From Swiss-Prot:
Homotetramer. The lineage of its organism: Eukaryota, Fungi, Dikarya, Ascomycota, Pezizomycotina. Signal peptide: none annotated. This is NAD-specific glutamate dehydrogenase. SMART domains: ELFV_dehydrog.
Length: 1050
């Protein structure tokens, strides 16, 4: 913190204010806060003499003389009118003295002259409307003056609120923060009787904080405030801000306060929220209160260095608005409820329809959410595609390739996001009817609604689903429109619960019934599905079983084109990852799940905010709401308790601790097991630190060498996913092969004579990309091509024109220097049916062995083509399962220990020292990962030799056999046999846990459903690994007879 005596940068206003007395009130009325509450629950502000106090500008009279001289010399304004124009500008517009102190006489003269010119220009207009517009923008402050009608949103002209918002409030430079003051002139412009327009003045100033690096939890105004705010704000105003900031620092959504002003028709609305979490909300708030026939006399935006923004708006009924509007108190009540909805999506895709009054805020945000839904789930393949599948031979590679290409083509053409937007925008009445149906189910009306009931949307008859279907058919004009609008009905019928109507939300989340998904595209039915929409992103969470585990990944896009591709593939990629996880989780109690968050094109640096909103909004649907007014109960059509188990994935490893602590702060009883991969101080077992995923991958690599009696040191190896990644770095550190190529996010590193191992290990330990490789350690045939490189000549004379394109396709090159390929990173489907032929030469695979460490790197049909060409392929669902085993055993420990035991035995102390039990438990987890990997490797190798079936098929067959038997066993009578149950659990649970806690205590603490899952998965996996995926009908009897014999001996 800055010390009181520390020198601070010069600040023109603050320096002038230091010792100025006396000060007089601002020309705008301001008010003092008293701890008095009236009948509507608002605090009451009584005095009109305090609030913001403008400093007296002692040099004002002298400045006016200088301004007059400049204007007269300019000659643009008739000399007889100069005094009147100056007096009007200085005294009638309500401009604060701060402006006159900050500006030099020349700038003031220019502004007065410009305003006069606007009046002259208006005189020549046919409608004689005076439209005065003025702007002055500098790097540290700005001024905007515009003509506006109270209570009306203008769609023409410069739209200064949007401009100052995008340039100053939501600007890209996060080191600069700006405060805003805006006033409306008391009188109207023009001489005409029906003139309604007034001048609106905006003043923007760069903040100069007392302590610019304040802690996010700091709330003392004397530490976190801007110096100009401290100089201008009175004691009572500071108290209002102090109170709301103290609440805001512990809240993730907006905090809203309303103050009545005694003896006035005005009310003061104060909104506090975390800075830069709601881009566009300043101008959107104006649209919101205009919708309810309300206007503002003054607005302030104050920034604080702890990361909080506070907006203070003085509201009154807009007297000039025609039409019926509710009383101010009721309008304000509705506005405060809708601010949390606006905060979630300040600028939705249909916002202009709200600003123009065509649709309500709820209707436009609902339409935006369904617009997102439609992009992912409009059934674009149709019945013709289903017929084609039936007609073609799935075993014929050329047929499969045709289907694959047709599926991609059908999904990319016709229904673009813009086309869907255009269709929805052309049917506002249908949107209104469909929203009414949605709200009739999910809007819970309580006493809070009864007291201030006004219709937030025009009254609409709620139609049944059948009547909605008829209305859609009747209103639309073609098949495409019917498909899009019918998707609204699909969405409404799929929503089981949502936080759409709960206060203080930060994003919109929907728990959907996934039964609407077409079986032909998604053959394995999902158990659960969440859709989350934030102002920065969209995302899904999918799971295949009630108790399921999987990571949360954030997808970034390097360009708009990359975003469009990522958006198109988002759900399919999520489904594929969750499906892989389901197969990968065969050895553990949990089924497969996955969460994917896609950042919007202009929000690529907002991954933390997107993740936090995603987690918090999902928690809204998992936790029981017990704080009325903050988290109200929701309509729950699902009707059962749900728990999600999550973990780290791409771009989320550093966010896991926050998610764990946030779940604890929100009162989740399962906070210890909510996320795995958390830091050791919270009892986590970091996969990267202990190489958990790599240990499993290495068992498959070593297994191939063992079976074929190969010398690893003579194996030439290629790897995607470099030394900067979790899996890539540990693969380098544990390997003993000769690396010939590494591809990572920065580019390609290749050396046919072998890449220097010591230099690679140095990068792996530092988690550095290959861009940091010392190229002096390459041989004469080696090279490095970075993504940003162009026109690079390789040692063999080949010219690389584009480094990024070279990086993206390097793994497909036939250069004859790769024996073993281990993908440890890279985008899904990097090798598919259309590209796999580049790895096949004269019917033979150019790479003999592939162990797929990265999820979904190779499509299933491409794997089969490679195996057909003689390649030994072990797929991701088999090889990459070490992390899930570690995560599962981490959760088991958190469920088995009580809170005190968990902290003692699983959490590192403040100095980073690991408890003795923790160290031993990690070793047991590592051994378990290697044992499970060896068991599956041997089972697949053995069954391949017996049946000749491709290993990629056998991997899936084993997974399916285990998961199917697992489900049967959990429901079987075997679970009811106490001897068998205890015997299996004793074998399945880690010995260390049993010795430390005791089997009986573990059984008592761990939920019954979780114990059943442990029982089923252990028995099923051990049986299938021993007897194969297609055992005889007597095999299980033999297996259990042997186990019963052992039990009886005990």
């Amino acid at each position: 913190m800055d010390s009181p005596s520390a020198p601070v940068p010069a600040h023109k206003l603050v320096d002038r204010l230091k010792d100025q007395t006396p000060r007089h009130p601002s020309p705008q009325p301001t008010h003092v806060s008293y701890p008095k509450v009236n009948g509507n629950g608002h605090r009451v502000l009584r005095s009109a003499t305090v609030g913001y106090v403008a400093p007296v500008f002692q040099g004002k009279a002298e400045q006016m003389k200088q301004v007059k001289n400049i204007i007269v010399q300019g000659g643009w304004i008739p000399e007889t009118l100069v005094d009147g124009q100056i007096a009007w500008f200085y005294n009638e517009l309500g401009i604060d003295d701060v402006y006159f102190q900050l500006e030099n006489p020349q700038a003031v003269a220019n502004h007065i002259t410009s305003l006069y010119a606007a009046k002259v220009a208006a005189f020549s207009r046919e409608d004689k409307r005076e439209e005065i517009r003025l702007d002055m923008e500098a790097s540290d402050h700005a001024i905007y003056i515009d003509t506006s009608e109270p209570g009306m949103t203008s769609f023409d002209g410069p739209r200064y609120e949007h401009r100052l918002e995008s340039k100053y409030l939501d600007g890209d430079d996060t080191s600069k923060r700006f405060r805003v003051e805006t006033f409306r002139s008391p009188g109207v412009l023009g001489q005409k009787e029906n003139s309604k327009a007034a001048l609106r003045c905006y003043f923007v100033y760069q903040c100069l904080f007392v302590d610019s690096n304040a802690d996010p939890k700091e709330t003392r105004l004397e530490v976190i405030s801007d110096r100009m705010f401290l100089a201008k704000a009175t004691k009572n105003t500071k108290q209002i801000y102090q109170d709301i900031i103290q609440v805001a620092v512990s809240r993730h959504g907006p905090v809203i306060e309303v103050f009545d002003i005694e003896g006035s028709e005005e009310m003061r609305l104060v909104v506090a929220f975390r800075s830069r979490t709601a881009k566009g909300i300043f101008s959107a708030l104006s649209d919101l209160y205009h919708y309810y026939g309300v206007t503002s006399s003054r607005k302030y935006v104050e920034q604080f260095s702890n990361g909080i923004t506070v907006m203070s708006i003085y509201l009154r009924p807009a007297a000039n608005i025609d039409g019926k509007h509710p009383p101010l108190e009721q309008s304000i009540h509705q506005i405060t409820k809708e601010i949390s909805l606006l905060y979630c999506l300040p600028q939705n895709k249909f916002h202009n329809m709200f600003a123009s009054g065509e649709l309500s805020l709820q209707e436009t945000i609902y339409a935006h959410c369904v617009w997102v839904f439609v992009q992912h789930f409009l059934n674009r393949l149709g019945t013709e595609y289903t017929s084609l599948i039936a007609a073609l031979d799935p075993k014929n590679n050329s047929h499969v390739e045709i289907l694959s290409k047709m599926k991609k083509r059908l999904r990319t053409e016709t229904f673009t996001p813009d086309y869907i937007l255009e269709i929805i925008s052309s049917h506002p009445q249908l949107v209104r009817a469909l929203y009414a149906s949605f709200a009739s189910v999910h809007l819970r009306v309580g006493s809070d609604y009864d007291r201030h009931l006004i219709a937030p949307t025009p009254v609409m008859e709620v139609l049944s689903d059948a009547r909605l279907k008829e209305k859609i058919t009747k209103d639309v004009s073609n098949e495409h429109e019917e498909m899009v609008m019918t998707a609204f009905r699909v969405f409404n019928n799929a929503v089981l619960k949502t936080n759409f109507f709960t206060p203080t939300k930060v994003a919109l989340s929907f728990r959907l019934n996934p039964s609407f998904l077409p079986e032909v595209e998604y053959p394995k039915p999902l158990y659960g599905m969440f859709l989350v929409i934030t102002s920065e992103s969209r995302g899904f969470h999918l799971r295949f079983k009630d108790i399921a585990r999987g990571g949360i990944r954030i997808v970034k896009s390097r360009s708009k084109e990359a975003y469009q591709i990522n958006a198109r593939n988002l759900f399919d990629e999520n489904y594929g990852l969750a499906s892989t996880q389901q197969r990968k989780n065969k050895d553990i109690p949990e089924g497969g799940s996955k969460g994917v968050i896609l950042l919007d094109p202009k929000q690529q640096d907002r991954h933390r905010e997107a993740f936090e909103k995603y987690i918090d909004s999902i928690l809204d649907l998992l936790l029981k709401a017990e704080t009325p007014g903050i988290k109200n109960p929701i309509v729950d059509l699902y009707g059962k308790e749900e728990i999600l188990f999550m973990g780290p994935d791409e771009n989320t490893a550093d966010l896991v601790d926050w998610a764990t602590e946030h779940a604890r702060a929100r009162g989740a009883p399962w906070w210890k097991s909510f996320f795995t991969g958390k830091s050791p101080r919270l009892g986590g077992i970091p996969h990267d630190s202990y190489g958990m995923t790599t240990l499993s991958v290495r068992e498959y690599v070593k297994g191939i060498y063992r079976k074929l009696e190969l010398d690893p040191s003579k194996i030439r190896k290629m790897q995607t996913g470099g030394p900067d990644g979790d899996l890539g770095s540990n693969e380098i550190l544990l390997s003993n092969e000769t690396y010939t190529a590494i591809v990572d996010g920065s580019g390609v590193l290749c050396d046919p004579n072998g890449i220097d191992k010591d230099e690679l290990r140095r990068l792996a330990k530092a988690r550095a990309m290959i861009s940091n490789f010392d190229i002096a350690k390459l041989s004469k045939d080696g090279y490095r091509v970075l993504c940003d490189d162009t026109n690079v000549t390789l040692p063999n004379g080949e010219v690389v024109h584009n480094g990024t394109a070279f990086r993206n396709t390097y793994h497909l090159r036939d250069n004859g220097i790769t024996d073993m390929f281990v993908p440890c990173g890279g985008r899904p489907e990097s090798i598919d049916l259309s590209s796999v032929n580049k790895l096949i030469k004269d019917g033979k695979s150019t790479i003999p062995y592939i162990v797929e460490g990265a999820n979904l790197f190779i499509t299933q049909d491409a794997k089969l083509r490679l195996e057909e060409a003689g390649c030994i392929v072990y797929k991701d669902a088999s090889a990459n399962k070490g992390g899930v085993t570690s995560s599962s055993l981490e959760v088991l420990a958190s469920l088995s220990f009580d809170d005190k035991g968990f902290v003692t035995h699983m959490c590192h102390d403040s100095r980073g020292n690991a408890p003795e039990f923790y160290q031993a438990y990690v070793k047991e987890v590592q051994n378990k990962i290697q044992d499970n990997a060896r068991l599956e490797f041997e089972a697949i190798w053995r069954e391949h030799e017996q049946t000749g079936l491709p290993r990629s098929v056998l991997s899936d067959k084993l997974s399916l056999a285990i998961t199917s038997l697992d489900e049967d066993l959990q429901r079987s009578e075997l679970w009811d046999n106490e001897k068998i149950r205890r015997s299996v659990l004793a074998d399945a649970l880690p010995n260390l846990l049993i010795n430390k806690i005791g089997l009986d205590t573990i059984i008592e603490r761990v939920p019954d459903s979780y114990l059943r899952a442990i029982f089923g998965s252990y028995l099923a996996s051990r049986f299938v690994y021993e007897f194969g995926s297609s055992p005889s009908q007597f095999a299980f009897y033999d297996f259990m007879s042997k186990r019963m014999g052992n039990i009886n001996k005990e």
